Amino acid sequence: MIFKLNVRGAILVAAAITGLVTLASPARADRCDDSAKELTNQVERLKVNFRAANVVYLSHPAAKELSVGCRGDKYSIELYAKGDRKPTPEFFSLVGSMAAIVFTVTKDDTTTGATRCLKRMGLLRGDKVVMRYRRLNMECTRTKTDASIAITRGKDE
C-alpha cells in the first residue's frame, strides 16, 4: 500500500487546528487593568483616566494624582497618591482602602502605615520618609504645596 500525501488537506487541517486553539484560549488582562477595575468597583467616586505603558492613572476628589503601576525593575506593583501638604482624613482613608485592595492586606494595616508615613514628615525627619510596614515599602515625600506617598511591594515578596 502506498499512501498519497495530500498537501492541501494537511495544510487545511493544520490551519483549522491553529484557528481553534487561538479562539479557544481566553484573553488575559494585565494585572494593572485588573487592579484598576477592582479599585473603581469598590472605591466610591474613583475613575480611570487613562493607561500609559505599565501605569493606570486614576482620579478621585480627595487626591490630586493617583496611579497604579505594574512590573517595575525593583517592584511588582506600585500605588502612588498625591494630595495636599496637610492630608485630610479622607485622603488617608482613600490611600488605605486602595492599598488594601491592590496589595490584599487589611484596610486597617494599610491606613495605619500610610498615616504613619505621611505624619512622620516634618522638621525632625525632613521632607522624605522611607519606611517599611507589613511587608510594604512606603516612601513619603513633601513639597511646599503637596505631599505624596508611593507604596510598593518588592518582586521577591
Spans of features found by a protein language model:
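Cleavable N-terminal signal peptides
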Residues: 16-17, 27
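Short glycine-rich, low-complexity/disordered patches
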Residues: 27, 48-57, 104-134
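Bacterial N-terminal signal peptides that target proteins for export
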Residues: 2-14
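Sec/Tat signal peptide C-region and signal peptidase I cleavage site
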Residues: 23-29
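Extracellular/mature segments of secreted proteins
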Residues: 38-43, 76-81, 124-128, 147-152
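Long, charged/polar, surface-exposed segments that mediate recognition or autoinhibition
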Residues: 70-121
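N-terminal secretory signal peptides
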Residues: 30-74
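Short, exposed beta-strand-loop hairpins at the edges of beta-sheets
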Residues: 128-155
